[in-house]
């Protein structure tokens, strides 16, 4: 008896898998980290100083941090103490729309996205993580101590998305509803296709106050055709129905296909690099652990 699709090992996403990711995701620096598969965009926001407390002056305190108004009022020196914003709040937006439930080789892009989300959550376990799943129902959940509830949410919302039902709201709609706290960093995990203008507008607004790291997932079939065989394709939209073949054995067609794919990727980079601090590209034909440990996901 054949397995149900959601139970197939290349499709299923289990909580033990996400728990095991911590074994390699929390390493300080992946081996060979110089091969980072990312590009720098606009300059990042420098961590600011947050006022922590006011106390009586002590030897060694910075003179420039003396509060002269309080000192004059009380007749003895008082110092304002500050702490640097090292522990940024981290908001993670994961796209689980139907387009992410595609994969031509070893996995669905949505599953790789969930694994990446889990790795980033484990990496920043001591930060305040907030997870937003863009799917049938946009889900928003903040970390309260353990990261386990966030990992359980990833499994649950991934499972819901396997139905591939059309969404009533766009990724731009979900972005427009994100209210980030001061100094928070936003990580977005989504498809590799060029952004709609509405998404670019939302990114532009958010980037004024927040650092944005943008992860794109690209399937091997979205980069080039296999050299042998034909792949059936069908387009079925209102007022548009088409059936045909992608012929990887035809050298001219295969070359034009690859050129179009590269042009699309380049166009997406040109859109995003002025709007985000870091732009990453993940290969859906490789495991996340392989890309992480080879340094392709290094964020340094």
Show which residues each predicted segment covers.
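Residue-level marker of alpha-helix boundaries and capping positions
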Residues: 111, 193, 258-259
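Von Willebrand factor type A / integrin I
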Residues: 1-33, 37, 42-43, 180-182, ...
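Von Willebrand factor
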Residues: 146-184, 197, 219
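Amphipathic coiled-coil/heptad-repeat helices and related helical stalk/stem segments
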Residues: 50, 117, 171-172, 198-199, ...
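Short, flexible loop segments at the rims of nucleotide/cofactor-binding pockets, characterized by
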Residues: 69, 161-167, 190-192
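A short, compositionally biased
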Residues: 130-132, 151-152, 226-229
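DG-centered beta-turn motif at the end of beta-strands
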Residues: 68, 95-96, 182-202, 212-217
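An amphipathic, basic-hydrophobic helix/alpha-beta surface used to engage anionic
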Residues: 1-145, 185-189, 222
